[in-house]
Regions:
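Surface-exposed, low-hydrophobicity beta-strand/loop segments enriched in small/polar/acidic residues
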Residues: 1-141
């Protein structure tokens, strides 16, 4: 799960929220990174995250619910865990898992978004990292 560690602007402890329409037949978890596609919330996975989900919700096939999400910006520092051991260092870019709720510790695949590591509390699976949303996209080697 991604949680908000701090906001670097010095004015507020948490970013603003907004309500975003759900995508049909999608399961959202509190702490998952969210992207917007066709005006609806989707799990960020390999897309650029713009929001952080604040509730657990499973959307039905013709659901019209709106989930509440924090708006993420460059000054929002997040805390999460690694799904696997990593050799990445501070400033490195980590992919996020398919449920968009943890960093994998793997480098970004070509054309995919992830998170920038701000600090590592550890490098083993289950260790915590501090990170922020990245504008960088993985490139081929």
């Amino acid at each position: 799960m991604f949680t908000i560690e701090k906001v670097l602007n010095g004015r507020i402890n948490h970013p603003e929220t907004e309500f975003i329409p759900v995508t049909a037949s999608t399961t959202y978890k509190k702490g998952a990174l969210i992207a917007i596609t066709s005006g609806k919330a989707v799990l960020a996975g390999s897309k650029k995250a713009t929001h952080l989900c604040t509730e657990d919700y499973t959307a039905g096939a013709s659901d019209t619910h709106h989930i509440q999400c924090f708006i993420l910006s460059d000054d929002v520092i997040l805390r999460t865990t690694l799904t696997a051991d990593t050799s990445l260092v501070k400033g490195g870019m980590s992919a996020i898992n398919t449920t968009a709720d943890e960093a994998t510790g793997a480098a970004l695949a070509t054309g995919k978004y992830g998170v920038e590591i701000v600090d590592l509390i550890g490098t083993k699976a289950g260790s915590e990292i501090l990170c922020k949303i990245s504008d960088a996209v993985g490139a081929s080697a």
